[in-house]
A protein has these predicted regions:
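C-terminal, surface-exposed recognition/capping segments
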Residues: 3-52, 57-74, 78-192
Length: 192
């Protein structure tokens, strides 16, 4: 007998059988952005910079002096359970999608770029366009991926481009990621 599908997940009919969450972490609404997590951290915070990043050791000016994990020290390239925000916040069985998971989604689903215009809450005479992706699986079921943009100084154009994290460390052809690289995300350009 097949296991029941958790209420907050959806089976898109992917070849791997992987279930996807119906919403981003930090919200139960599929159209909301949810919370922002630094890669390898399991809680949100008010200040996202080198000196507050748990995987960096910095000097007093915030200059990175050492990468504490996922570096040439340990050669780990995929988030471990204790560093996975989905596992820490949603429980056993949940995890941040890998590059392979995202590729399966890109290869096997129909992607539709949709823009919805909504009134601004404080001034209903003004409107804001909100972009999102409707991702329909082989079985006809779908998930919604809001256009998230990036975070602060890295990239922040949530009206168009979308960046979702992967559990994989970005690898350069000659080794592990550069300590200044923020390429741990799937970039979805508007429209695909």
């Amino acid at each position: 007998e097949p296991m029941p599908i958790p209420k907050n997940c959806i089976d898109l009919g992917l070849p791997s059988g992987l279930l996807w969450a119906k919403s981003n972490m930090g919200t139960t609404e599929p159209t909301e952005l949810g919370d922002y997590y630094a890669w390898g951290e399991t809680s949100t915070k008010n200040d996202y910079k080198n000196s507050t990043y748990k995987l960096y050791k910095t000097d007093k000016d915030g200059i990175i002096k050492e990468i504490l994990k996922y570096s040439e020290k340990d050669w780990k390239t995929v988030l471990e359970r204790e560093d996975d925000a989905a596992n820490a916040n949603l429980g056993v069985g949940y995890r941040i999608p890998t590059q392979e998971d995202w590729q399966e989604l890109l290869d096997n689903c129909k992607w539709e770029a949709v823009t919805v215009t909504l009134p601004i809450e404080l001034d209903p005479s003004q409107t804001k366009s909100i972009a999102r992706w409707i991702v329909t699986g082989p079985n006809g079921k779908y998930i919604i991926l809001p256009a998230t943009g990036g975070f602060k100084t890295w990239y922040n154009d949530s009206d168009k481009d979308t960046y979702y994290t992967t559990a994989n460390l970005y690898l350069y052809p000659d080794g592990l990621a550069d300590k200044y690289s923020y390429k741990r995300a799937v970039a979805l350009k508007w429209p695909i």
